[in-house]
């Protein structure tokens, strides 16, 4: 038992001496243990473009849902700017060249659709006038309405009443044409709105690519260090 106590005392003494040696091995300066030198961070800073893109998207989403075409175009422009800030420099240049090639075609299609819509709208107005006139003529002859001309009553002649079947057919055709024109015009309006939105998106994207970083801040933003022409 005594030998065990002696062995235990020796082990604790050796452990204490080892801890003391490790403590003394540290260099003390002004009674404080010196710390390893601090180095400035050399890792590349994270890109600021995704943050800017998120802020632009937050601006677009914080507004109320676009009820008019102008508000929808505004949101499309915000989305395009955010996309331009999020994309890589090479991808931005590729998209820009593709947009420049496709924009003239989109504008040409938009002009053709507007001309077609104008023709259909004019046809719709003519059909509406024809339908209104034939309806009035048919109703007048059916009710045997008498018209006063120079103080004398003049009834609808019998030969005019015989035209009622033909006027009814014309009225039916004009009404059907009105329905077709209205449906076609509604479809054209949707196509025109869609193309306008695409034109706005592509133009806004190209404007964002051409934009100089000095318009935002004095700190260069990645991807805009060199002016893009």
Curated annotation (Swiss-Prot):
Major subcellular site: host cell
Protein name: Non-structural protein P8
Cell location: Host cell membrane; Host Golgi apparatus
GO biological processes: symbiont-mediated suppression of host innate immune response
Keyword Membrane part of the UniProt annotation: yes
Species of origin: Bluetongue virus 10 (isolate USA)
GO CC, alphabetical: host cell Golgi apparatus; host cell plasma membrane; membrane
Subunit field text: Forms homooligomers via coiled-coil motif. Interacts with host OPTN; this interaction inhibits innate immune response.
Domain of life: Viruses
